[in-house]
């Protein structure tokens, strides 16, 4: 639904929820930004990613050198960019005080990077509950998710925004 309204999916390209969200967006011709845990040349060696780039269906962004390989540290750093590029995020399952999902959500809350919503319905993890205690918004059901305004309303300007100068 969010993609059909024009929202862009920002994906860490990880297996699991990241790939499912990315695939669902692509199935309905949505836009996807991929933030890999390795250099762009490395991730582009994967046939599926390379084909999506060539078709103009995904934009890859990375703060890392093009040929850099995977490391846990880079994966943790990548999460910052996923949150920073997002207006809002949904944490489906987080470990308690460990792992990339926890670190990214915790940092996003501390830095006020993006709205952080956390699944608190059936099957919610202890990490999810703890993130709500730190300020994330609880989402106890699918209906609540859609009704909560997770999908931000488009910005409306009375006038055109001012173009800032770089130099």
Where do the language-model regions lie?
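Glycine-biased, small-residue-rich flexible motifs in mid-sequence functional cores and linkers
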Residues: 1-167
